[in-house]
């Protein structure tokens, strides 16, 4: 299956690594954007100044608890008011999200460091 290569826009900047991983895992641009907008869990990324968001694949409710067998993850970086992000001598525009990587996780991943509430509020203001 040949997937369409995502184009950079005013809202999203796609790295070559993220495009490669999208092809590897069979993820479309629309699905990655959906994970960013409608995530189930949000954590600090393993890279400095990044955020990782997760959306479960086919969640089911068993005995009143939400369960699933696979997860979709997206790691991205958004430019803050005091940050300057450079990409090949081009500054990322205000409110543009740089998508660094995407991946599928088989199973339920353990919760790592959740983002503090005050930082989540600051991110939502952007």
Where are these regions (language model features)?
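Ribonuclease/tRNase effector modules and their secretory precursors
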Residues: 1-126
């Amino acid at each position: 299956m040949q997937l369409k290569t995502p184009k950079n826009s005013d809202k999203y900047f796609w790295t070559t690594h993220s495009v490669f991983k999208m092809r590897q895992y069979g993820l479309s641009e629309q699905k990655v954007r959906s994970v960013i907008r409608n995530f189930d869990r949000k954590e600090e990324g393993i890279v400095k100044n990044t955020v990782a968001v997760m959306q479960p694949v086919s969640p089911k409710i068993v005995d009143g608890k939400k369960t699933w067998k696979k997860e979709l993850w997206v790691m991205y970086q958004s430019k803050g008011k005091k940050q300057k992000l450079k990409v090949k001598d081009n500054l990322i525009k205000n409110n543009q999200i740089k998508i660094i990587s995407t991946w599928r996780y088989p199973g339920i991943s353990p919760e790592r460091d959740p983002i503090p509430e005050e930082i989540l509020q600051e991110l939502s203001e952007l």
